[in-house]
Amino acid sequence: MLEQLKADVLAANLALPAHHLVTFTWGNVSAVDETRQWMVIKPSGVEYDVMTADDMVVVEIASGKVVEGSKKPSSDTPTHLALYRRYAEIGGIVHTHSRHATIWSQAGLDLPAWGTTHADYFYGAIPCTRQMTAEEINGEYEYQTGEVIIETFEERGRSPAQIPAVLVHSHGPFAWGKNAADAVHNAVVLEECAYMGLFSRQLAPQLPAMQNELLDKHYLRKHGANAYYGQ
């Protein structure tokens, strides 16, 4: 069942240590099939160097039930499911504790758009969620993590298609894309922007966001209706 998608999700998960986004097993990647009926996700707590495509777990999106796989799915499965159910434009999701993005998450800070590297991928600041309540933490924690991400985008009027990443307060980053590989790509860029942003703020503590005109130019030339970047 979904053998190609399992292979794709395995490859995306293996890309996390290759890009230095994870330590030990601190991360996961998932993707949905074309019908958006099924999600394939990394198994919980399995080391990357022994993981195979057969270890990937198939979960029904509507019910959250495991329909194929001998291992337990990632503990973050309910977060992934919440995002897939809410946003049809998301086809793949990555969660990591990558060092510099997690620094911003732990500080509870949005990552401003300070330069064109950021603007090429994210149409504005990458938001950090609010702190979760005690009830949310002690209840269905992973599901509520997804809900607080959705709340952040909806209350701020942000588009998850235009800003394909979020920082979860005191936790770490999630990134997404049209498929698993695209989500990993965005997670790599997020980590690089977080790294550059940390030093930019140290050098210039009052640094304002980049010019709106420059943000528009770089984002829209790649992603706008009249995009002209690339082949």
Curated annotation (Swiss-Prot):
Any one biological process term the GO annotation gives: pentose catabolic process
Cofactors (names): Zn(2+)
Keywords associated with the record: Carbohydrate metabolism, Isomerase, Metal-binding, Zinc
Residues that coordinate or bind Zn(2+): 76, 95, 97, 171
InterPro entries according to UniProt: Aldolase_class_II_sugar_metab (IPR050197), Aldolase_II/adducin_N (IPR001303), Aldolase_II/adducin_N_sf (IPR036409), AraD (IPR004661)
Gene3D superfamilies, per the entry: Class II aldolase/adducin N-terminal domain
Metal-binding recorded as keyword: yes
Binding site for substrate: 27-28, 44-45, 74-75
A GO CC term attached to the entry: cytosol
Cofactor note: Binds 1 zinc ion per subunit.
Catalyzed reactions per annotation: L-ribulose 5-phosphate = D-xylulose 5-phosphate
Presence of keyword Cell division: no
Function, as annotated: Catalyzes the interconversion of L-ribulose 5-phosphate (LRu5P) and D-xylulose 5-phosphate (D-Xu5P) via a retroaldol/aldol mechanism (carbon-carbon bond cleavage analogous to a class II aldolase reaction). May be involved in the utilization of 2,3-diketo-L-gulonate.
UniProt name for this protein: L-ribulose-5-phosphate 4-epimerase SgbE
Taxonomic source organism: Escherichia coli (strain K12)
